[in-house]
Amino acid sequence: MLSELHGLNDCWNQAWLEKDAATVERLMADDYIYVAPNGLTLDRQAILAIIRSPSYRLDHATRTEVVVRALGQEAAVVRHRVQAGGAFEGTSFTDDHRCVMVCVKQIGEWRIVMEQGSFSSK
């Protein structure tokens, strides 16, 4: 189970680096929600619009400090730090966030239900 969730985390990161919208879509639960460090909430459709946007580019993304905690057999929390940079809608960004992902097993596959990012204090 833990190795599956580490794999999910790696796959999610790689999909964003490769702008692989099909994989991002497959890994998100239908009711996926992202809470950004500024409090903005983005649903599944908003996230898919970003990754599919020609103006979105992720140049690098490194996930460290990954901790997976099982919550029974069908739920887990994944905590990590992500340091990334790229551009969206003509604006460059550099991120350093601590993130929490809530994952559930649905029809035999792990899906990401929600993520929350917070600005890292380093």
Residue ranges of each PLM-predicted region?
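A beta-strand edge to alpha-helix "cap/lid" segment located at domain peripheries
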Residues: 1-27, 31-122
